[in-house]
Amino acid sequence: KVYGRCELAAAMKRLGLDNYRGYSLGNWVCAAKFESNFNTHATNRNTDGSTDYGILQINSRWWCNDGRTPGSRNLCHISCSALLSSDITASVNCAKKIVSDRNGMNAWVAWRNRCKGTDVNAWIRGCRL
């Protein structure tokens, strides 16, 4: 599923991401835009053999199990395929675990490069939340 911007913002808010660990909703919507273009089915292979899955491009080396990443830690205790669902609950729950780590949202390269230090509230402007 490809979410609309405000549709995704509403879903993320409902699932408790707004100001989770101090990151406003705009940060999460911005990260999803530049990680997956709001597409829950997005997958991208990395040079180390791991793969990033779903709307927030969660990595199989650390966070989920795809059965083909050597030494996967599966810290979210989830199958990577669950992160491709049109229902983003599994992705959000895993993202909460990731952002609680010491790096916070810096774990997402696209957030670090495209969202950090910008006016992320623009991503939720005009949305009825």
Curated annotation (Swiss-Prot):
UniProt cross-references to InterPro entries, sorted A to Z: Glyco_hydro_22, Glyco_hydro_22_CS, Glyco_hydro_22_lys, Lysozyme-like_dom_sf
Top EC class for this record: hydrolase
Disulfides per UniProt: 6-127, 30-115, 64-80, 76-94
Cellular component terms (Gene Ontology): extracellular region
EC number(s) on file: 3.2.1.17
MF terms in GO: lysozyme activity
Any Pfam family hit: Lys
Domain C-type lysozyme: from-to ranges: 1-129
Keywords assigned: Antimicrobial, Bacteriolytic enzyme, Disulfide bond, Glycosidase, Hydrolase, Secreted
Cross-referenced SMART domains: LYZ1
Subcellular location, record wording: Secreted
Active site: 35, 52
The keyword Transmembrane is annotated on this UniProt entry: no
Disulfide bond found in the keyword field: yes
Catalysed reactions, semicolon-separated: Hydrolysis of (1->4)-beta-linkages between N-acetylmuramic acid and N-acetyl-D-glucosamine residues in a peptidoglycan and between N-acetyl-D-glucosamine residues in chitodextrins
Primary location recorded for the protein, binned into one broad class: secreted
Domain of life: Eukaryota
One GO-annotated biological process of the protein: killing of cells of another organism
Quaternary structure and interacting proteins, as annotated: Monomer.
Note: Lysozyme C is capable of both hydrolysis and transglycosylation; it also shows a slight esterase activity. It acts rapidly on both peptide-substituted and unsubstituted peptidoglycan, and slowly on chitin oligosaccharides.
Assigned protein family: Belongs to the glycosyl hydrolase 22 family.
Free-text function comment from the UniProt entry: Lysozymes have primarily a bacteriolytic function; those in tissues and body fluids are associated with the monocyte-macrophage system and enhance the activity of immunoagents.
PANTHER family, sorted: LYSOZYME C (PTHR11407:SF28)
Protein name: Lysozyme C
Species of origin: Syrmaticus reevesii
